[in-house]
Amino acid sequence: MAVSCPEVMYGAYYPYLYGRAGTSRSFYQYERFNQDLYSSSGVNLAASSSASGSSHSPCSPILPPSVSANAAAAVAAAAHNSAAAAVAVAANQASSSGGIGGGGLGGLGGLGGGPASGLLGSNVVPGSSSVGSVGLGMSPVLSGAAGHSLHSSHRTHAHSLAHAHTHPHSHTHTHTHQTKEEDLIVPRSEAEARLVGSQQHQHHNESSCSSGPDSPRHAHSHSHPLHGGGGATGGPSSAGGTGSGGGDGGGTGAIPKNLPALETPMGSGGGGLAGSGQGQAQYLSASCVVFTNYSGDTASQVDEHFSRALNYNNKDSKESSSPMSNRNFPPSFWNSNYVHPIPAPTHHQVSDLYGTATDTGYATDPWVPHAAHYGSYAHAAHAHAAHAHAYHHNMAQYGSLLRLPQQYASHGSRLHHDQQTAHALEYSSYPTMAGLEAQVAQVQESSKDLYWF
C-alpha cells in the first residue's frame, strides 16, 4: 500500500515534528516558564501562580506538600524584603560568635507593599540556638524548637527564596535564595549594601533554575544534615560554602561580591623601565619610544667601544698573518713566463731521444726529437701530426698513401713514447719521397681552407 500523504509518512518517523506522542516529548507539551514566580514588581503572585504540589515547571521551586501555592507565593514575595535584614543579622552574629544564635527573621514588609503585620516575625536572641516560631500571617505554618545550629564556617549563604523543610524530628533548615531576575529588576536595599561592604563573602546571583547536576551554574550542591541533631551545615566539604579560614571552600560558580582589588604598583621592585628613575624616554613616533637607562656621555662610550674592538682585531691579524713571500707558492705563481723543467725519463730509448733533441735546439717542439732521429719522411709525418689528426676522418681516401702513425694509434696511446717509437721505426728505412710530401702538404692546405673558415 503506497502512502502518499507526507504528514502520515513523516509523522511516523519524526513524531516530534507533528506533536505525536513518541519517545521524545514535544516542546509544547511542557508547561511554559512561569515568569511571575520570579518577579517581585508588585504583581499579585497568588493569582498568576500555576505551580501546585503535583505539577511544576522545570524552574519552579519544589516546596513541601504542606505549603500551598498561595503560601509559597507569599513567602516568595516577602523573601526579597526580608533577605537583606536577615543576612545582615546573620553576618553580624557569625562574625561575633561560633554559631548563629537565633536565626529568626523579623521586621518584614508585607505582600505587595502592604503593612508589616508580623509576617515571619520573631526576635533575635544572641545566646540561644533555636529558631523561633516562623509564622505566616497569624497562623503558624512552620514551627518547632530546633537544635539545628548554623556553624560559622558556612558564612551565611544569602539566598532569597525561603525553603523551609519540615521534619519529624522538628529540625528546621531555612535557606534564602535570590534569583537572577531579582538582581536585575529590584535595587538593593541599604542593609544589603552594608552587607556587601562587610568582610563576609556573600553568594548572590545564583538562580534556583539550574538545579541539574551537570548544569554550568550549579554551584551549590548542599548537603542538608536533617537527621543529625545539631549538625553543622556547610563546612569545608560544602561545595558552595566558604571555609573557616575565610577563603572559598571549593565553590565553582559562586562569585564573591567583594574580591580584593589587584593592585600592582608600577615601580615596585625596580622592574619597570620608567620606574627606575634613571631612564629617559624619547618618543620617536606615536608608537615608538626609546628608553635610555644610561646616565653619562654616550658618544664617548661608543667611540671607546669601537676603538677597542678595532684594536683587538688588528692585534689578532698581526699575530696570525704572514707575508706572501713566506708562503709556499710554486715558481709559476710569481713568473708567468716560467717553463716547468722536464723530468728525467726512465726509458733508455726516450732518454736518448730527449738528449738528441736538446742538442739540436728543438726543446719546445714535442715532435722534433722523434723526427731528428728518424729521417725526412718521419719528420714530415710528425711535424704535421696535429693537423693530420684533426682531419684524419676526411683523409680516409688517402689511407693507402698517407701511412701516418696517428691514424693507427688511439688517442691515449698516441702520446706514449714506446708506441710512437715503434711506428717511427717502421718508416725509418724508407727513402725520401718528395712527391708524397707535396701531396700531404696540398691535402692539409685544402683541409684548412675547408674547415677553418
UniProtKB/Swiss-Prot annotation:
Record key words, sorted: Activator, Cell cycle, Developmental protein, DNA replication, DNA-binding, Nucleus, Transcription, Transcription regulation
Compositionally biased spans, kind Gly residues: 227-253, 267-278
Localisation: Nucleus
Nucleotide-binding is among the record's keywords: no
Transmembrane segments: none
Residue ranges of the region described as Ser-rich sd binding domain: 279-335
Compositional bias segments (type: Basic and acidic residues): 178-193
Domain of life the protein comes from: Eukaryota
Biased amino acid composition, Basic residues: 151-177
Region described as Disordered: spans on this chain: 145-279
GO molecular function: DNA binding; transcription coactivator activity
Record's function text: Involved in determining which thoracic imaginal disk cells will form wings and halteres, perhaps by interacting with other nuclear regulatory proteins. When in combination with scalloped (sd), it acts as a transcriptional activation complex that regulates gene expression in the wing. Binding to sd switches the DNA target selectivity of sd. Required and sufficient for cell proliferation at the dorsal/ventral (D/V) boundary of the wing imaginal disk. Also required for cell proliferation in the wing imaginal disk, mediated via activation of E2f.
Subunit structure, as described in the record: The Ser-rich protein domain within the C-terminal region interacts with the C-terminus of sd to form a complex which acts as a selector for wing development. Interacts with Dhfr.
Additional comment: Loss of vestigial function selectively eliminates wing and haltere formation.
Record protein name field: Protein vestigial
Species for this entry: Drosophila melanogaster
Taxonomic classification: Eukaryota, Metazoa, Ecdysozoa, Arthropoda, Hexapoda
